[in-house]
């Protein structure tokens, strides 16, 4: 029988409840504020047609994609931090979301607004970047510090490459890409969720299936190898899952920073344990991104900020607080 601590169970239930409450609030909020009863009526198909369209065609895709993208980024960050055994191990710092964004830019310049091409190019960009960082960091094995430093260097080069692409693109493409680069959920509809959303769901399932390997790797390479785990193959497979999660999220909403870095930290702090780490990180990531999107919509009405601006601001503050706390401990 699997024992689950009371605090962990309560934490997960509270996170789920908070996601539901924030989701309902997101369906109520907008240029026209609705009552909760009107939202449920629209979801059941009992509301006027115009109200049903506002809720189900405009607001519901945005809320669900915020939850899904946040969960994907949270799980991706938790996998990277587990593999690197380093609190700074995340796709933001390593440059993998920048690689995915490079793929998106190339697709926009070459293929315009084709969603399938954008999603596939984002994944190719993220995977190629991760393989490049992996190969450059390989020296009879992978050293975590070397991997992070090389990732930061590759990210800097990709930022320069992306700037060059924007300068070479047409004005319309550059403006569209500039908005996307800030990380935005504005204008998300059901038609724009494919094929990225199904890919995220598949990768979340794959991550759940790899939890046992991840836990064994956290015990140390020698212990994992003694228990029959192929260390480098498992590490590469888990990194691939995390990179595809990041790339698919980037294809949907652009490069949204700090969710992958912050969500696993918050999950561990509020639950006091690393058990169910991916589940906690997914719930925290989903709640953080949805809350940030609600702030982006509501704080500066009638203007809407890109959600990436809010996540960078909040994530930067959290990172500063975290560093201050760590320095005081020492």
Swiss-Prot record:
Family statement: Belongs to the binding-protein-dependent transport system permease family. FecCD subfamily.
Membrane side Cytoplasmic: residue ranges: 29-62, 114-117, 168-190, 257-275, 325-330
Name the UniProt record assigns to this protein: Ferric enterobactin transport system permease protein FepG
Keywords: Cell inner membrane, Cell membrane, Ion transport, Iron, Iron transport, Membrane, Transmembrane, Transmembrane helix, Transport
Transmembrane segments: 8-28, 63-83, 93-113, 118-138, 147-167, 191-211, 236-256, 276-296, 304-324
Membrane topology: Multi-pass membrane protein
Keyword Cell membrane appears in the UniProt entry: yes
Complexes and interactors: The complex is composed of two ATP-binding proteins (FepC), two transmembrane proteins (FepD and FepG) and a solute-binding protein (FepB).
One Pfam entry name: FecCD
Subcellular location: Cell inner membrane
InterPro entries referenced in this protein's UniProt entry, alphabetically: ABC_BtuC-like (IPR037294), ABC_transptr_permease_BtuC (IPR000522)
Gene3D superfamilies referenced in this protein's UniProt entry, alphabetically: ABC transporter involved in vitamin B12 uptake, BtuC (1.10.3470.10)
One GO MF term attached to the UniProt entry: transmembrane transporter activity
Stored CDD domains: TM_ABC_iron-siderophores_like
Keyword tRNA-binding: no
Any GO BP: siderophore-dependent iron import into cell
């Amino acid at each position: 029988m699997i024992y689950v601590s009371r605090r962990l169970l309560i934490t997960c239930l509270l996170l789920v409840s908070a996601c539901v409450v924030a989701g309902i609030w997101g369906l109520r909020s907008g240029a026209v504020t609705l009552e909760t009863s009107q939202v449920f009526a629209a979801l059941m198909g009992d509301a006027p047609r115009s109200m049903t369209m506002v809720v189900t065609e405009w607001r519901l895709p945005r809320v669900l994609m915020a939850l899904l993208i946040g969960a994907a980024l949270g799980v991706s960050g938790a996998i990277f931090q587990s593999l690197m055994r380093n609190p700074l191990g995340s796709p933001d710092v390593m440059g993998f979301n920048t690689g995915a964004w490079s793929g998106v830019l190339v697709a926009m310049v070459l293929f315009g607004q084709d969603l399938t091409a954008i999603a596939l190019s984002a994944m190719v960009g993220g995977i190629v970047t991760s393989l490049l960082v992996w190969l450059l960091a390989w020296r009879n094995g992978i050293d975590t510090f070397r991997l992070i430093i090389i990732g930061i260097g590759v990210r800097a080069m990709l930022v320069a490459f992306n700037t060059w692409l924007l300068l070479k693109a047409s004005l319309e493409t550059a403006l569209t890409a500039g908005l996307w680069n800030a990380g935005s959920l504005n204008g998300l509809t059901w038609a724009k969720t494919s094929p990225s959303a199904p890919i995220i769901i598949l990768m979340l399932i794959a991550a759940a299936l790899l939890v046992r390997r991840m836990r064994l790797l956290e015990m140390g390479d020698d212990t994992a190898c003694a228990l029959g785990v192929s260390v480098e193959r498992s590490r590469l497979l888990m990194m691939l899952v995390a990179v595809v999660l990041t790339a698919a999220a980037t294809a949907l909403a652009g490069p949204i920073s700090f969710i992958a870095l912050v969500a696993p930290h918050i999950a561990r702090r509020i639950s006091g344990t690393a058990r169910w780490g991916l589940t906690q990180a997914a719930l925290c990531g989903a709640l953080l991104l949805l809350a940030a999107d609600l702030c982006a919509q509501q704080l500066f009405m009638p203007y809407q900020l890109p959600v990436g601006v809010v996540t960078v601001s909040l994530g930067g503050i959290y990172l500063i607080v975290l560093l201050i706390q760590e320095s005081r401990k020492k």
